[in-house]
Regions:
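Soluble catalytic domains of membrane acyltransferases
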Residues: 1-185
Length: 186
């Protein structure tokens, strides 16, 4: 890789997905990525510690007002651009909020909109996106240790219209995903 890249990845496992990208980069002698992590995951101290050790930065997903969300999105956009262009630091970010539970891997257009918030007005969109050096990433696991939990969540949404996570459900999913059997990975 001639310059730092923004790796936009499908999302199955917040720990292992970027770790696999880092392994591939390390294997070729390239810098490893900084990892975008949602603030919803930082409910336990050991998770916060794990994220800090792994060069993570926070994506504020829990802002309460539209103005606060816009400010957080602008700051995130500016940071990603700064990391790539000034720090020469590659970045990993999921293509959409949360893990894919339905197997549909489609980049959320809001992600691209967020990335463009930092674009100077006179600059062409294509030129700005070229600066970000976006690299799509797709990772597949033969087995998903969280598949029953994901199916239960989708079924609840289908029958009740919504799903309420328990307090540390995301953390339990991280642990199960990290420790569970995944079979072949590609």
């Amino acid at each position: 890789l001639s310059k730092p890249s923004l790796f936009i990845s499908n999302h199955r496992d917040i720990v292992l997905d970027p770790a696999l990208v880092n392994y591939a980069l390390f294997d070729i002698g390239a810098k490893t990525v900084e990892i975008a992590v949602g603030d919803n995951l930082l409910t336990k101290e050991w998770i916060s510690d794990l994220m800090r050790i792994n060069k993570s930065f926070i994506v504020k997903r829990s802002e309460k007002t539209k103005r606060a969300m816009l400010t957080a999105s602008k700051n995130l956009s500016a940071y990603i651009h700064h990391a790539l262009t000034d720090k020469q630091q590659p970045i990993w970010i999921a293509q959409k909020e949360g893990r894919a539970k339905d197997g549909i891997d489609k980049t959320n257009s809001a992600l691209i909109s967020m990335l463009l918030l930092n674009k100077p007005k006179p600059m062409a969109i294509k030129d700005y996106l070229d600066e970000l050096n976006i690299v799509p990433v797709s990772i597949a696991y033969q087995y998903d240790p969280c598949d029953q939990d994901k199916a239960k969540e989708l079924a609840t949404i289908e029958t009740e219209g919504k799903y309420e996570k328990s307090e540390h459900e995301d953390i339990n999913s991280i642990t199960k995903g990290l420790m569970g059997y995944k079979g072949k990975i590609h």
